[in-house]
Amino acid sequence: MECNLGTEHPSTDTWNRSKTEQAVVDAFDESLFGDVASDIGFETSLYSHAVKTAPSPPWVASPKILYQQLIRDLDFSEGPRLLSCLETWNEDLFSCFPINEDLYSDMMVLSPDPDDVISTVSTKDHVEMFNLTTRGSVRLPSPPKQPTGLPAYVQEVQDSFTVELRAREEAYTKLLVTYCKSIIRYLQGTAKRTTIGLNIQNPDQKAYTQLRQSILLRYYREVASLARLLYLHLYLTVTREFSWRLYASQSAHPDVFAALKFTWTERRQFTCAFHPVLCNHGIVLLEGKPLTASALREINYRRRELGLPLVRCGLVEENKSPLVQQPSFSVHLPRSVGFLTHHIKRKLDAYAVKHPQEPRHVRADHPYAKVVENRNYGSSIEAMILAPPSPSEILPGDPPRPPTCGFLTR
């Protein structure tokens, strides 16, 4: 896609090699990622030393113990702190990520029917180790030598990231299933203990009834809590690995990226944790308007907090101004953790969408009877996201429109 916006090529004098190297220094926290020089070929993960495999969780343990075990298995001690940070941020960081619902559509541990959920622990599973550093089959593309190759390059980067994320997510789904089964066994044991010593005719039936009730009242909420931690780790780990390799690759070609014209058609693409272009030195537009320096500084503040490389825009950044600026927070606006939770709920609901259940309970006291939602995920997802929206407003579950990309000609 060629966009002929004039005969003058934007100046790249300020984006010479020395400033590019300084930009990397400013944005990069070496304590998080170790020795970058050892990864100069970009063929191995910057996180390859941190998490290779995760063991199966305890056969049976309380959700609180499982949560701490998951933190240790993922080597994700920063996870609870980051989730707390997401409670005080308003940006949508996650809804542009692919949901990959097909990975969950046959996962019976996510069934809305408690009997289905309980049946998943009727047989003993074999102990399994999970490779959490699985790589995608599509390699990170190299930047083009000429601006004419930029649109195709940006699409290839996006495709490569999507393949990488899906490959990793397949391993994470297996880990999620084993944690779900540990919760089920814990609730099963708790229900059995409550009937010990009781003078009742059918203690097993009583225990099963209590287990079904626990599944409805507690199980889905505990699964959602573990899933928030698990998928925050997935998204951050893959995005960090991919983005730092991408930044190192793109920062070596400032002249090419100075000819890029890039438009984020939706604001959530701009605030998203993943950006296919990190050295965006040409003309950049946000929802059809020129990107402001303050907006760039604000999203870079979040990126720095998350250990991600900053987005650099040579024509937007202001001389002698900081690269980051803390955004304001409003309790009346959606929160980042709400966007994450909504995104995860789409995964957890995939089984119910593919395998709809006959409604067992409806509200009979209303002329428009509706099915009662049995699954309790905890906090109201809708309340964490938005007030009643207008019909035209973009919702987190809506598929994002692709950004537009072109190049300037001399």
Swiss-Prot record:
Q: Which UniProt keywords apply?
A: DNA-binding, Host nucleus, Host-virus interaction, Phosphoprotein, Transcription, Transcription regulation, Virion, Virion tegument
InterPro entries per the UniProt record, alphabetical: Alpha_TIF, Alpha_TIF_sf
Q: Which Pfam families match?
A: Alpha_TIF (PF02232)
Coarsely, its chief localization is virion
Which BP terms does GO give this entry?
DNA-templated viral transcription; regulation of DNA-templated transcription
Q: Where is this region: Disordered?
A: 388-410
Q: Could you state a single Gene Ontology molecular function term?
A: DNA binding
Cellular location(s):
Virion tegument; Host nucleus
**Chain segments annotated as transmembrane:** none
Task: Name the source's superkingdom.
Answer: Viruses
Q: Name one GO cellular component term.
A: host cell nucleus
State how it assembles: Associates with the VP16-induced complex; binding to host HCFC1 activates VP16 for association with the octamer motif-binding host protein POU2F1, to form a multiprotein-DNA complex responsible for activating transcription of the viral immediate early genes.
Task of the protein: Transcriptional activator of immediate-early (IE) gene products (alpha genes). Acts as a key activator of lytic infection by initiating the lytic program through the assembly of the transcriptional regulatory VP16-induced complex composed of VP16 and two cellular factors, HCFC1 and POU2F1. VP16-induced complex represents a regulatory switch: when it is on, it promotes IE-gene expression and thus lytic infection, and when it is off, it limits IE-gene transcription favoring latent infection. May play a role in the aggregation of tegument proteins around nucleocapsids during virus morphogenesis.
Family from the record: Belongs to the herpesviridae tegument protein VP16 protein family.
Name of the protein in its database record: Tegument protein VP16 homolog
Which species is this record about? Varicella-zoster virus (strain Dumas)
